[in-house]
Amino acid sequence: MQIRNILVICVGNICRSPMAEYFLKQNHPNIDIESAGISGMVGHSADDKAIKCMDSFNIDMRQHIAKKLNADHIKKADLILVMSQNQQKHLEQTWPFSKGKVFRLGHWQGKNVPDPYQHDQDFFNETCLNIQSYVSDWKSHI
């Protein structure tokens, strides 16, 4: 199956999922990639610390606006990347039709992506590097 639409999910859609979204867009410019939050902080911009991390990769996330996950996002996506096993279970229980297309971003390394929200810049930087690594792991599978 050819992947045309990728959805990246985290809790608030202001830290992890936008970072992954923007890294994926850089690697896959011809794929429709978006992000959303399970309990999205609707209308908020990306966290300043996340923006600072991404700036170091010359990726500008200042235009990101958080949105809340809904069934239409799930239906449209060919691949859904989440940050943890708990998020995967939540999606598959809430939207059973999502089974088979929901994977952890860190799937290939067997890792969850801890939430950096309200942590210091160093934690954000480490999270950003992990996300970049996990996104790279997906390159040969997309």
Predicted regions and their residues:
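Phosphate-binding/catalytic loops
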Residues: 79, 85-142
